[in-house]
């Protein structure tokens, strides 16, 4: 075997594509969850002020609250999905 073949075999054994993708997904969703919690808290504070200021802003606040809850569920669902994919593919 020549040097290039040995290098290619070592590269393929240490840098499996699926391991790289699953670890990147886990890393990204972890960072998004950290940022997401700050954004969710900020938006909930804005919604609280909107509820205090009367009828019109209160209707808008109810819509925003639904969007924030759905967004939070999607954000944490993506993190859980990435962890599940990483756990399932770890055996292969």
From Swiss-Prot:
Its main location: membrane. Pfam families: TrbC (PF04956). It is a multi-pass membrane protein. Keywords: Cell membrane, Membrane, Plasmid, Transmembrane, Transmembrane helix. Coiled coil: none annotated. One of its GO terms (cellular component) is plasma membrane. It is found in: Cell membrane. The chain crosses the membrane at residues 34-54, 65-85. It comes from the Bacteria. The keyword Hydrolase does not apply. This is Uncharacterized protein pXO2-18/BXB0017/GBAA_pXO2_0017. It comes from Bacillus anthracis.
């Amino acid at each position: 075997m020549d040097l290039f073949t040995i290098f290619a075999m070592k590269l393929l054994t240490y840098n499996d594509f699926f391991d790289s993708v699953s670890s990147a997904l886990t890393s990204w969703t972890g960072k998004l969850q950290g940022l997401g919690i700050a954004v969710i808290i900020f938006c909930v504070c804005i919604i609280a002020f909107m509820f205090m200021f009367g009828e019109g802003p209160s209707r808008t606040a109810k819509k925003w609250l639904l969007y924030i809850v759905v967004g939070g569920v999607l954000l944490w669902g993506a993190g859980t999905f990435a962890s599940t994919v990483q756990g399932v593919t770890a055996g292969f």
